[in-house]
């Protein structure tokens, strides 16, 4: 679950989480749990790692989704949020994709996708701090993901500074 992942990485990080205004952002991010509970979270078989590199086109034109090691029961909107973030879809591209994807059998919640995008950006920003404490160098990856989450939070009513 994403909120547990956030707390897990926070506990693994030895130093300070030095992202700007982190405590206020954290509070706003954790409050998204209430929004998700109101909307409802579906549990279906999901891939969990929908990055472009996991889509392979065979010579015959068939498309294969590989690397199922992280698959689990999760909300399908999590996978769509990951696909949109990791593939850098524009809003128009997201709308186009969803026009093909959505049906009676596969309803879409754009609000859940928005929330899951924020959560994924926060998780990956914390993951980056943890990895960099252990010698990795990801450049501006972590702060870029953090800033994108903050921007999305601000566009939806801001960040509670209290």
Language model features with spans:
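ATP/Mg2+ or Mg2+-diphosphate-binding catalytic cores
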Residues: 27, 127-162
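An alpha-helical support segment within catalytic cores of ATP-dependent transferases
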Residues: 1-48, 59-60
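A glycine-centered beta->alpha junction motif in the catalytic cores
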Residues: 6-19, 122-139
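Active-site activation/catalytic loop segments of kinase-like enzymes and analogous catalytic loops
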Residues: 77-105, 118-136, 148
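Pre-DFG segment of protein kinase catalytic domains
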Residues: 45, 64-67
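Start-of-helix signal in alpha-solenoid helical-repeat scaffolds, especially tetratricopeptide repeats
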Residues: 111, 115-119
């Amino acid at each position: 679950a994403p909120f547990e992942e956030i707390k897990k990485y926070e506990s693994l990080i030895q130093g300070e989480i030095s992202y700007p205004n982190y405590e206020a952002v954290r509070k706003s991010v954790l409050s998204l749990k209430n929004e998700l509970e109101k909307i409802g979270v579906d549990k279906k078989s999901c891939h969990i790692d929908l990055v472009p590199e996991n889509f392979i086109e065979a010579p015959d034109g068939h498309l294969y989704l590989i690397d199922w090691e992280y698959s689990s029961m999760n909300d399908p909107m999590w996978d769509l949020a990951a696909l949109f973030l990791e593939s850098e879809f524009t809003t128009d591209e997201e709308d186009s994709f969803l026009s093909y994807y959505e049906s009676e059998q596969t309803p879409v919640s754009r609000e859940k996708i928005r929330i899951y995008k924020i959560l994924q950006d926060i998780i990956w920003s914390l993951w980056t701090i943890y990895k960099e404490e252990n010698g990795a160098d990801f450049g501006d990856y972590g702060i870029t993901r953090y800033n994108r989450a903050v921007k999305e939070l601000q566009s939806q009513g801001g960040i509670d500074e209290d």
